[in-house]
Amino acid sequence: MRHAQFARILIIACLLIVVNASAQNVQLYVSSQAGDRLTARSGGSFQEKQASGAVSFEVDDSVHYQTIDGFGASLLESGLMVLNALPRERQENVLQSLFDPKEGSGFSAMKTELAGTDFQAAGPWYTYDDIPGDVEMKHFSIARDLGPNGMATYIKRARKYGSFALQAPMDYPPDWMLFDVNNNQDVNPKYFPALARYYIRYLEEYKREGIEIDYLSLFNEPFSVYTKIPYEKIRVLLRDHMGPALAKSGLRTKLMLSEAPERGEAGRYYPIVLNDPAARKYVAVIPYHGYDFKNYDKIAELHRRYPSLPLWMTEICYAYEAGTPRSMSLPVYEFSDGDFWGNVIMNDLEVGASAWIYWNMILDEKGGPWAISVVHGNPDPNEQHPVVIINQQTKKVSYTGLYYYLSHFSKFVRPGAVRVKTTGSSDGVRAMSFVTVQGTMVAQLMNSRKQDVEANLGYRGKQLHVMLPALSISTATWSR
């Protein structure tokens, strides 16, 4: 009798364990037009599937796509200048909100720049060696980057709160390396060895400061926007100069091809470099910018042609100079604007992007300050939209809709996560899923409609029923 009772108890216990395991409790995090801001909620659990009129999606974690490298924005002088205007404790609070993976967004992929660009506003236009003809880099200096508003300082302060991959492109080399800064901004090939030396010195000087640049991108928006070097010459510089120089240097930095301003331009010009095996062997990542806000198919095609190379979307923003209509007031404070950016992030991820990096992380209430150097393509005015707005008069810190939508990805889809197959579609409602390094499932659910939407998320024969608030992003997490 005792044995029979024990057997019944054991069977019941096992059944309870099975039922509990199959329930798969879900944690939900919501940001919405109604006022939720990464708000934690119980998401219920996966249950037996039932027919309903809800929008339906299905997750298949047996089908894997790209590995995620990270999400973030750019570290530039203008942002640190604005941040430094706050009391020190509040400065640290802002940095924590951006980089701390537990208490903040956990930004995990960041961009900086080699010297001058349009938001290096702590001084006049500069490079690291502005002494004409100094091919041996005897006057090379990163002194400005070490100042209170400098990029090296910014990077160090950010890394107090979290780790992140760091990539760095260059708008222009020193003017004396160009044929003519006013009339022909192409690089004179006789300076290719000196330019390779310039890149290496930058990496070495930053390493001496405890900062290893993970990826160096030869040029930022070359040929059509900044340095007017054609891709045929970028191929030569990469293949015959910079690639071999970096290989001999002992540095662990890897190379990115260069960063086209638009997806369409990337699709058109990148094969000039990548179809040369001797040049391609030095390329670790294919970066591109998103200023056309379309042509995602061109990135999908690059992914099909060069499947072994990760794709990074490394710059995008609202900017009048980049085509944002003047009827839109910049910067944008409305939370609802985040929906636009959430869709852009999903679009890039769907065509294979492994990282997504916005341009200015912090700016003031005027969308600045910006640097002015017309000859280098830095106009005045140049208002842009950041992730975080800090009012220089009131000292109010405003976290934009972009901040929250981007945070749903950076906080929950950590580096090493893999995007998995998610099917189902409905106008204005989207879903995308990932499996993390720890084996946790993450689903991002976006509702772009102006009314609440019921949704079902299917997984391994079960179904999760959730209510998606109007204009919202919801992150669901559960154990596999």
For each of these PLM feature ranges, what is it?
Residues 69-77, 108-114, 118, 165-169, ...:
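Structural recognition of the beta-strand scaffold that forms the well-ordered cores
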Residues 468-480:
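C-terminal beta-strand-rich structural cap/linker in extracellular carbohydrate-active enzymes
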Residues 142-147, 151-153, 244, 252-255, ...:
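Glycoside hydrolase catalytic-domain groove-lining segments
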Residues 408-412, 422-460, 467, 471:
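Carbohydrate-binding surface patches
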Residues 172-276, 295-304:
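Active-site cleft segment of glycoside hydrolase catalytic domains centered on the general acid/base Glu
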Residues 38-213, 236, 240:
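N-terminal catalytic cores of secreted or lumenal carbohydrate-active enzymes
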